[in-house]
Amino acid sequence: MKGEIDIMKKVELLFDTIRSPYDIAHIIQVANAIDCVIYTAGKNSIPFDIPKVVSKVKSWNITGKVKEIHYDTFDEAIADLRSKGKYLIGTSGNTNKIFYDLDLPDDKDIVVVFGTETSGLTLTKQEMLDETIKLPMDKSKVDFLTLPVAVSAIAYELYRKYNFE
């Protein structure tokens, strides 16, 4: 039933080589709030349980434990998630498709894919996904959104769409 918190998880997040403890702490906060799974890829990604991340999360009184699944490579993550029937949406400021113009499938779980904190998703990686979207913004005032801001905006809007519409 819409509006209930214990419904099937439909929003999941994949991060390609995430390395900032502060960004990870923010992402854990969002993931706990919407009860989603987090996937990470890349040998250089830092684990979510390092002391710097754990202490920041504890300082915010976050008590839930987020489910993190790690893949050694981005390709491995995409192959596994595809084999599970997930619909993969990439994020990039260099695409023309606006997030709000998405026509989401009703029969598949959604995985939103975010690139590295510094360079985003490469074109090659974007081509591996079902589609790529961007958040609308005034580019004359802001060139980009930080990873935690983009994650929050997209994850919460998808959560609202699936649970409260």
Could you say what each language-model-derived stretch is?
Residues 24-25, 50-51, 98-101, 122-125, ...:
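Short glycine-/acidic-enriched loop or helix-start segments at secondary-structure transitions
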Residues 125-165:
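Structured adenosyl-cofactor binding patch, chiefly the S-adenosyl-L-methionine
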Residues 42-47, 70-72, 119-124, 141-147, ...:
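Short C-terminal domain-edge/linker segments immediately following a structured domain
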